[in-house]
């Protein structure tokens, strides 16, 4: 009888004692750059990563979009901080100056910034991509299919090392007789494209972030001319995806792909487990985060043209050399 009473009492306790609820999912904040979703560039690539992460990880999302002004960027980031986000992801280098200030004001908040390494703060993970590796493969591939013996890279004025250590090195490793040239641009990208085509380049690597549709127009205009030497293009995604159309796609030889979606998944997974990326990107400058490269699939090289597809084995060998480049 005593045993029955004890059991009955235990059953009553079981009914009355509340079952501990699972912990509420963390909140991930994301600050999209100008235009937000639908830009077919870094915003969309980041959103794709969020969606993929949501299939296997438990978290909520708070999203904001900036109009691009410094005041608005700060306003958007502060709104995410106020919502107690476990991690705030800023898409694009435009948020750099804002995070440089707010990271010190809110040292317990974890931030990440995509495609930028300018914020020196231990609570900011800079997520960047080994662009030199991609440039090496672009140069190697351009030389493989060049018929004029001259290939070109259109670059920003601060990309001299990218040309020397990446594109030019890839060209020389591919075919020593092919001449790599570079056109640094501070003004018109279309003029730069016209000039390198006039100089004899028949494959162009466009390394600039934020594409200029005029470059594509110049290439198309050249290629539709009778008896013209056809020009191929190697571009970067998601940097230049916005300007790629059904008309220009047929002139794409290859694409260097920055796997922003993969980086977003990794960042969120780290945050949920209570960690962050703290690899040394530049110890002297105090920059931390992660550099994604060919190893691990952070940078991919997508062959577009049939002509280049026949060079696939050689490009795979070149990729093994490219992934040893640290920058």
What positions do the PLM features span?
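C-terminal segment of classical bacterial N-terminal signal peptides
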Residues: 13-21
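A residue-level marker of the well-folded mature domains of exported/periplasmic proteins
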Residues: 22-327
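Bacterial N-terminal signal peptides that target proteins for export
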Residues: 1-7
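Hydrophobic helical h-region of N-terminal Sec-dependent signal peptides
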Residues: 7-13
